Amino acid sequence: MNSKHLVGGLGMTTTGEQVTVIVYPYRLPKRLKPLTECVLETQKNFSNEAIGTVLLLCIDPKAKFELVCRNDLRVVIVPPNHPLFRETLETMPRLCGFVHLVYAALHDLASGIASSKVFAYAVNQCPNDYREWSKGIGDEADEVLSYIIAELSTDPKFYRQFAVFAD
């Protein structure tokens, strides 16, 4: 995993603090050091003033709400069952396809269809059809999701709403 696989944007807290919001659509790794290094690398694409707090929205159902600090970087891991997860998605600029993908995975997790697995879905604007687009789990899903992000990033509207972080 590297920074080109992360999607997100800049947000503002209710207290006016600028934060970086990143959607992390994979299982959370057991060791968080490589992940925080990747986030730090991602931050550099924003400029130094963005370094501070990162909200990492994680769709891994086993993730716990926690704060991880590395150097000057504070990463807040926000699991899908935490109120901050939904609130943050709702206040971010809409990338309807990607948000649909995240919610599709969350819907299945909540329904027990994939109780311990996170699926990656190809983006499909017909909500009833997304299960047909299931592409597997684990590394295979990571590759599919990377492909989806790459495809979306060619759309000019994508850049106006969200940032795609590339190496």
For each of these PLM feature ranges, what is it?
Residues 1-167:
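Charge-rich (often acidic), low-complexity intrinsically disordered regions concentrated
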